[in-house]
């Protein structure tokens, strides 16, 4: 009997110790109470940048390569210059975000990733700190692929239009007016510089841009990772919008996400080349060249670069260096004729 009592006492002690240990252990995390997803919201400045980009692409791509006089050339140069270069590149990311929002699977993936207010704020902070974190969200790859294809299509459209304008710079030289010196060259250059420093206010609303993006059916794809910085940042901004964290109160975080130094450098170089070209251009056909090559083709190439897709090949003239012909051997010197005695 003593052994039985001792056995029961041991069991009782073990049970009590288990209760004590369980009481000292960590508490189970509280389940996050799901809340109604917020409305998708984009700050007005994002809408303005996306609209400015959309207006520029559509306006510049529609420039006709057919010119009948110098006035038409001047108007085309002015139309192509009327936007700040940095705004174009931030507009790439802003418009890309709107394109990503049209991927319903991605939007659902973002909402499933963060179901409560605290989780949404935490995920948004994570995306602001490192936009590439968005690639862990379900559906992000498909959204990124769509953004890459749409931006590439925009850039190629502008590039091809510029190529046609550039060709017309050679074709139009058959017409006398094209060889006349541009009127007020100094004023024309100053005007182009001032226009390219102005932030363009777009009249396009968020609804207009969403409708435009929804109608895009880009060819090609799907595009696989790795994605370009601009594409990833576009998708990250879209995710923050789904989380309700891309409104006016989040301008600082959004501004940090919408910075791609590689594309900003491309835009600055395009602007520099445009100004240098216009500075030395004299006849109207040279202005047409500046318009086609720099304002249009170079800008289009920057957008394609932002998409991460293959940039168009542009052959450049490389003169053939031919070896000098070997010099003919000198004829042997003739002996002087003997003097007659």
PLM features: residue spans?
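C-terminal motif of bacterial Sec signal peptides marking the signal peptidase cleavage site
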Residues: 20-23
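N-terminal secretory signal peptides that target proteins for export/translocation
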Residues: 1-6
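Short, low-complexity, Pro/Ser/Thr/Gly-rich segments in the mature regions of secreted, periplasmic
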Residues: 301-341
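Hydrophobic alpha-helical segments, principally membrane-spanning helices and signal/leader peptides
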Residues: 7-8, 258
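Acidic/polar low-complexity scaffolding segments in large eukaryotic proteins
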Residues: 8, 12, 25-248, 322-334
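Generic ordered-secondary-structure signal
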Residues: 9-13, 270, 280-281, 337-338
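Alpha-helical transmembrane segments
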Residues: 15-18
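Secreted, short cysteine-rich peptides and small extracellular cysteine-rich domains stabilized by multiple disulfide
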Residues: 250-314
């Amino acid at each position: 009997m003593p052994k039985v009592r001792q056995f029961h006492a041991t069991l009782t002690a073990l049970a009590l110790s288990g209760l004590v240990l369980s009481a000292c252990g960590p508490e189970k995390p509280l389940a996050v109470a799901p809340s109604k997803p917020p409305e998708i919201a984009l700050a007005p400045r994002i809408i303005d940048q996306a609209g400015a980009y959309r207006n520029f692409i559509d306006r510049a791509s529609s420039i006709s390569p057919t010119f009948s006089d110098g006035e038409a050339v001047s108007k085309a140069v002015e139309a192509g210059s009327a936007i700040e270069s940095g705004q174009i590149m931030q507009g790439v990311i802003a418009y890309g975000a709107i394109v990503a929002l049209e991927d319903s699977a991605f939007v659902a993936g973002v909402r499933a990733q963060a179901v409560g207010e605290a989780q949404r704020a935490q995920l948004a902070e994570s995306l602001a700190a490192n936009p590439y974190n968005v690639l862990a969200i379900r559906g992000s790859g498909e959204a990124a692929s769509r953004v890459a294809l749409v931006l590439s299509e925009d850039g190629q459209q502008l590039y091809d239009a510029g190529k046609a304008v550039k060709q017309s710079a050679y074709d139009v030289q058959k017409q006398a007016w094209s060889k006349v010196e541009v009127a007020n060259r100094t004023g024309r250059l100053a005007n182009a510089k001032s226009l390219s420093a102005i932030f363009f206010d777009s009249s396009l609303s968020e609804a207009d841009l969403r409708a435009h993006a929804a109608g895009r059916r880009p060819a090609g794809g799907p595009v696989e990772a790795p994605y370009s910085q601009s594409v990833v940042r576009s998708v990250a901004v879209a995710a923050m919008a789904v989380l309700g964290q891309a409104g006016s109160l989040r301008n600082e975080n959004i501004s940090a996400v919408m910075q791609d130094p590689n594309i900003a450098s491309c835009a600055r170089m395009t602007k520099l080349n445009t100004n240098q070209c216009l500075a030395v251009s004299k006849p109207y056909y040279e202005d047409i060249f500046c318009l086609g090559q720099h304002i249009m083709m170079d800008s289009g190439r920057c957008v394609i670069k932002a998409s991460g897709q293959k940039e168009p090949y542009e052959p450049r003239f490389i003169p053939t260096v031919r070896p000098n012909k070997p010099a003919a051997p000198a004829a042997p010197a003739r002996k002087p004729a003997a003097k007659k005695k």
